[in-house]
Amino acid sequence: MATLKEKLIAPVAEEEAAAPNNKITVVGVGQVGMACAISILGKSLADELALVDVLEDKLKGEMMDLQHGSLFFQTPKIVADKDYSVTAGSKIVVVTAGVRQQEGESRLNLVQRNVNVFKFIIPQIVKYSPDCTIIVVSNPVDILTYVTWKLSGLPKHRVIGSGCNLDSARFRYLMSEKLGIHPSSCHGWILGEHGDSSVAVWSGVNVAGVSLQELNPEMGTDNDSENWKEVHKLVIESAYEVIKLKGYTNWAIGLSVADLIETMLKNLSRIHPVSTMVKGMYGIENEVFLSLPCILNARGLTSVINQKLKDDEVAQLKKSADTLWDIQKDLKDL
């Protein structure tokens, strides 16, 4: 007796399970992980999306909730499991998992606890997707990108930290508000460590090729009557402000990560400020990851732009590198 499906559909080719071309995995289904997932789906970047987490009920619930929206996406397959076999064959793996900082906990202790989490996660990712590119989003992102690179054994062009892609987006938004011009037409770079010791490259800030520092030589200094330095201060403080107001940040970082993935999967060779291994650049001597303008394409992070930085900007970068190395050098089990 023929089934309804057999009566409805007349096959022309034999049914075979086709391997996905653009499979993306998100590790961790917290606020940030799910913002990454919805941003990836919204841009139709994946033909299969896999979610992984240790919290099985939440994981299943998030998967079902997304599957119920399948009519509104162009992603035919959404899967989830706590077993990493579900991630097999991923082109890109986004890592958002990690432990949160406890009150009064030192940064070193927080990082060490995350190292212990990553020691389980990273080998599993590489086991099932040996050719993937890993994007690390968990904080402190620059140190955890270094940890991922060490644990994965992958070449450095395939281990990327989300880094200052979001910091730069915040900077361009705030700049656009001040000038009344769309952020995409306001050009400026935040480099170095994601967060408190990031570096605003004032010498490169421009609109339509017009250097704003040439129009206002005091821009970014304490002597600036227009107080542009406040814009960078707001970039640093904005995450804390959002966390204070709603408990976490997620939408902007999710959109930022989807932006990076789009550049790679579509082989666009766009330039993004993301965290990469900077040893040997700008006089930095240790194996630390910091954000510099990097070219991303289908192979991963293929090149770094040699941006002309002023002496004080280089000094700030080196200071960031030293701060990170002070923590990294004491990490155990890497």
UniProtKB/Swiss-Prot annotation:
NAD(+) binds at residues 53-58, 100, 139. One of its GO terms (cellular component) is mitochondrial inner membrane. InterPro entries: L-lactate/malate_DH (IPR001557), L-lactate_DH (IPR011304), L-lactate_DH_AS (IPR018177), Lactate/malate_DH_C (IPR022383), Lactate/malate_DH_N (IPR001236), Lactate_DH/Glyco_Ohase_4_C (IPR015955), NAD(P)-bd_dom_sf (IPR036291). Its EC number is 1.1.1.27. The keyword Acetylation applies. It is found in: Cytoplasm; Mitochondrion inner membrane. The modification Phosphoserine is found at residue 44. It holds the Pfam family Ldh_1_C. The modification Phosphotyrosine is found at residue 240. It catalyses: (S)-lactate + NAD(+) = pyruvate + NADH + H(+). Its main location: cytoplasm. It comes from the Eukaryota. Homotetramer. Interacts with PTEN upstream reading frame protein MP31; the interaction leads to inhibition of mitochondrial lactate dehydrogenase activity, preventing conversion of lactate to pyruvate in mitochondria. Interconverts simultaneously and stereospecifically pyruvate and lactate with concomitant interconversion of NADH and NAD(+). NCBIfam families: L-LDH-NAD, PRK00066.1. This is L-lactate dehydrogenase B chain. It comes from Monodelphis domestica (Gray short-tailed opossum). The lineage of its organism: Eukaryota, Metazoa, Chordata, Craniata, Vertebrata.
